[in-house]
Amino acid sequence: MATNIKGPAIFLAQFAGDAAPFNSWDSITKWAASLGYKGVQIPTWDGRLFDLKKAAESKTYCDEVKGVAKKNGVEITELSTHLQGQLVAVNPAYDEAFDAFAPAAVHGKPKERQKWAVEQMMLAAKASKNLGLTATVSFTGALAWPYTYPWPQRPQGLIETAFSELAKRWKPI
């Protein structure tokens, strides 16, 4: 049976940062290869590593990105759109918490945030095609999550604030 699994591979999002070797595509792919990884999954929201819009529009850019990975001893396994995909379907109870995953320009504007997320997903599909990838990884959103799992984590003081508000409303009654 044929398989499309490539690896071992590593998801780069949790390592990307402002310090070398985690702050550029060239250095992070060298780092991943030095650890024995054969593949890398690119977080499409991190502009230090990848320009999603440019990748959707330019096969040349995608060829350059693939070339750097190959030169450094790894291949791209998938593009990751976990954060953007999550924003396609946010339960209104979580609007404020999920704003942290979107650009400031759409904070507090759920419809605009969702539109931005859908656009990001479309760009990722085009970029994946330009990279020659046949799969992508994402989250689908969390319309039912408030009823099943507390994610994203509650901000500090949320429960205390809720009980204080309940007290204000019910004490007069």
Model-derived features with residue positions:
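Active-site acidic/histidine proton-transfer and metal-coordination neighborhood
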Residues: 26, 31, 71-75, 86-173
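Aromatic- and glycine-enriched glycan-recognition loops and surfaces
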Residues: 21-26, 53-67, 115-120
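Structural motif
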Residues: 35, 43, 130-131
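A short, Lys/Arg-enriched amphipathic alpha-helix followed by its capping loop at the start of a domain
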Residues: 5-8, 30-37
